[in-house]
Every structure is written in structure tokens, then in C-alpha cells.
């Protein structure tokens, strides 16, 4: 009976030891699973943030492209009517009027118009050393040789720009200069079209160059005033 008691105690102890070990080992998988769940939650948030950032970057990139397209259209359209281009159009028109035939205008009015609307580069060249030498040589040629009639007005325009005082040249690019230029242009246009008789005669083969030049000068003077 004593042996039975000892064996039963061992069996009981072993029987109680297994559940104790089993109960002690059970919480570990739960901790691991809980850790895995929390880790999965932490890993999911950065992916969501990165997706939101990519979406925001895509929207901002599209808005930037639209803004660049609009600004490129503006930059393409504005240089066509810049002040520099308008000055060159007026200068070419004035030179064409100086040499044009088939018009009844007083061409002497073209000289101050040229001085008021010529680009600053041309005015600086005329007032510089090269312009003074050109005027000096032209004056010597005019004194000792026969001077072509077509070159009289360009020579006078060169001398006018050289000897013009600062107070007179300072109205270039201002409202006073624009008003004076528009008045001269309208007077020349009135003379040209009134002496041409009809609009059809103004666009004849002999007068078409002067007509286009006068229209160009008048339109440019009006745009300068605006």
C-alpha cells in the first residue's frame, strides 16, 4: 500500500505539472499575436500617408502644369505688342515715308515724329561718336558735292537728334510725347487721304507704300497713348 501511495503521488504530481506548464505557456502565443497585430497596424499607417502624399503631389503637379501653360500663352502673346517692337514699326514707317513717292504730305513733319518714336538704341547711336562722324561726313559731302534729294530728310533727322536738348528728348516715352506723335500722325493721315481723293486711289500701286506707312505710324501712336 505504501508503494501505491508513492506511485499515485507521482502520477498526481505529474498530472498536475502538465496542466501547469500548459497554462504557463498559453499566454505567449497571445502576446505574439497581439504584437503582430499592433505591428501590422503601425505598418499600415505609413503606407496610407505615403499614398496621400503621392495623391497631393500629383494634384499639385497638374496645377503647376496648368499654371505654366497659361503663363506661356501670356509670354508668347505679349512680345508682339511690346514697346520696343512698336518703336521699330514706327521707325520703319517713318523711313518709308521719307523715301516714298505718290503722296502729298509735308514730309518735314516726319522728322520730329522719327525723333520722338525711334528706339533708344538708334538715338544713342546717333548721339554717340559714330553718329557725330556720320553727320560730319554728310555735311562735308553736302557742302562740296551734289547731295541726293532723297537723303535730305534722313540727314536732317540725324542732325535734329544730335542737337536736340535734353528737355526735348526727355518727353520720349511720356504722355506728352505720345500726344504730340498722335497729333502729327493724324495730320499726315488727313493730308494723305484728302489729297488722294478716294480710298481706292490711296491703295494704288504708286501710293500703297505711303498709305501703309501712314497707317502704321498712326496706329502705333494711338497704342503709345493708350
From Swiss-Prot:
Disulphide bridges, residue numbers: none
Classification via Pfam families: WCOR413 (PF05562)
Transmembrane segments: 80-100, 104-124, 130-150, 153-173, 177-197, 206-226
GO CC list: chloroplast envelope; chloroplast inner membrane; chloroplast thylakoid membrane
Keywords, alphabetical: Chloroplast, Membrane, Plastid, Plastid inner membrane, Transit peptide, Transmembrane, Transmembrane helix
UniProt cross-references to InterPro entries, sorted A to Z: COR413 (IPR008892)
Cellular localisation: Plastid, Chloroplast inner membrane
Superkingdom classification of source: Eukaryota
Chloroplast intermembrane topological segments: 101-103, 151-152, 198-205
Topological category with respect to the lipid bilayer: Multi-pass membrane protein
Entry similarity comment: Belongs to the Cold-regulated 413 protein family.
Protein's name in the database: Cold-regulated 413 inner membrane protein 2, chloroplastic
Organism: Arabidopsis thaliana
Amino acid at each position: 500500500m505504501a508503494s501505491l501511495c508513492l506511485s499515485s503521488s507521482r502520477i498526481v504530481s505529474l498530472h498536475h505539472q502538465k496542466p501547469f506548464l500548459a497554462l504557463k505557456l498559453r499566454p505567449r502565443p497571445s502576446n505574439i499575436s497581439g504584437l503582430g497585430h499592433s505591428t501590422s497596424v503601425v505598418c499600415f499607417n505609413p503606407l496610407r500617408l505615403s499614398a496621400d502624399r503621392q495623391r497631393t503631389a500629383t494634384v499639385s503637379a497638374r496645377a503647376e502644369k496648368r499654371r505654366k501653360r497659361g503663363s506661356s500663352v501670356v509670354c508668347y502673346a505679349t512680345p508682339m505688342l511690346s514697346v520696343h517692337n512698336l518703336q521699330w514699326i514706327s521707325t520703319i514707317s517713318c523711313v518709308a515715308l521719307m523715301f516714298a513717292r505718290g503722296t502729298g504730305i509735308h514730309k518735314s513733319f516726319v522728322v520730329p515724329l522719327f525723333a520722338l518714336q525711334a528706339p533708344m538704341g538708334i538715338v544713342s547711336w546717333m548721339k554717340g561718336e559714330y553718329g557725330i562722324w556720320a553727320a560730319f561726313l554728310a555735311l562735308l559731302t553736302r557742302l562740296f558735292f551734289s547731295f541726293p534729294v532723297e537723303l535730305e530728310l534722313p540727314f536732317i533727322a540725324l542732325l535734329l537728334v544730335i542737337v536736340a536738348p535734353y528737355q526735348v528728348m526727355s518727353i520720349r516715352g511720356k504722355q506728352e510725347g505720345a500726344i504730340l506723335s498722335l497729333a502729327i500722325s493724324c495730320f499726315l493721315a488727313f493730308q494723305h487721304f484728302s489729297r488722294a481723293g478716294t480710298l481706292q486711289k490711296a491703295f494704288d500701286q504708286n501710293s500703297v507704300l505711303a498709305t501703309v506707312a501712314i497707317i502704321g505710324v498712326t496706329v502705333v501712336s494711338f497704342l503709345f497713348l493708350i
